[in-house]
């Protein structure tokens, strides 16, 4: 049995605690953590120079050049006009494993006039994994609005229910876009969820109706989650070190979890990268 390594990181458009936007540093930090088959990066910018002048360029193209053996998958959550063309912001997947299918899911954004908020989505890429396939979903949930974040976790739980049901009762195979995919072993859901483990949104995903298992306790038992935020950047995160970035997996995948590591040393972003290893049947598919 081989394995698939998946990295998740909110790179904050490459902005480090030192105030520099440095995508080569992001790439080097990813490689230092491990040889990831799939990278799931949040807060990737095209044209949003107001975030930082160095974020005005095409970060998707730049990151794709830094990982030439990986296929880029980018569908923006935010897509706006700008003086130099479209401005886009969202989640990027870079996959060395063959990408079999891509779906972007717009997440709920109920009205919340009390706080600023933005459109969020979940980017789904089904990739070849051994003799079958694995569904990898990355997201970045709403930070300011608790109501929107709660609705978004509910939608993610609902999606997992749909995926599981389709796996148990597949449709007949057709031609062209109706063609079937290889059997999908389950879902890996990762990203910046913007909630702590004691928020109700966490229970929506990991409770009986959520369909997901938190990979950290599944691997590390009762050990506290390694902090993924506020480790180095106390200006943005005065509450200090805590976890808000997670890997969740389908219950069927829990026995296949082989490792989960967090790099708490890097300050190349305001948040920390995580690397999950999942066992897959047969040789790795690349």
Question: Where is each model-derived feature located?
Answer:
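Short, electropositive alpha-helical surface patch
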Residues: 58-66, 92-95
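Active-site regions of metal-assisted phosphoester/phosphodiester hydrolases
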Residues: 1-34, 38, 78-79, 83-286
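A short acidic/basic microdomain associated with nuclease active sites
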Residues: 70-78
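Short, flexible/disordered intra-domain loops and linkers
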Residues: 16-20, 46-58
